[in-house]
Amino acid sequence: MNIERIQLKGQLAESKAKFKNLDVEASALVILIRSLLNPFEEDTTKLETQKALVSMQRLDELLLELRNLKSKIQKLEEYFE
């Protein structure tokens, strides 16, 4: 097995681990955002929109990174098929 192949397998493993961690963080942010923007709150002035906005911005960053990682993982997996 050549060195490049071993390095690519390492990149694949790292990418999968990073994807898993970011996916968990994204899921947690979705739960947090839903709690901050409670649809059952009758007084909309009590909604914590600033906190939700910051969380949404982070979620947007995570989703972009997750999409890029997913593409990278697919390409690496295709290489090893």
Specify the residue positions occupied by each region the protein language model found.
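Acidic, serine/threonine/proline-rich low-complexity intrinsically disordered regions
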Residues: 51-63, 67
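Generic cytosolic/nucleocytoplasmic N-terminal low-complexity/intrinsically disordered segments
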Residues: 1, 8, 17, 42-45, ...
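Short, charge/polar-rich alpha-helical segments
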Residues: 1-27, 57
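Long amphipathic alpha-helical coiled-coil segments
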Residues: 64-81
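A short, terminal or domain-edge coil/loop segment
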Residues: 3, 41-42, 79-81
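Short E/K-rich amphipathic alpha-helical oligomerization segments
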Residues: 20, 24-56
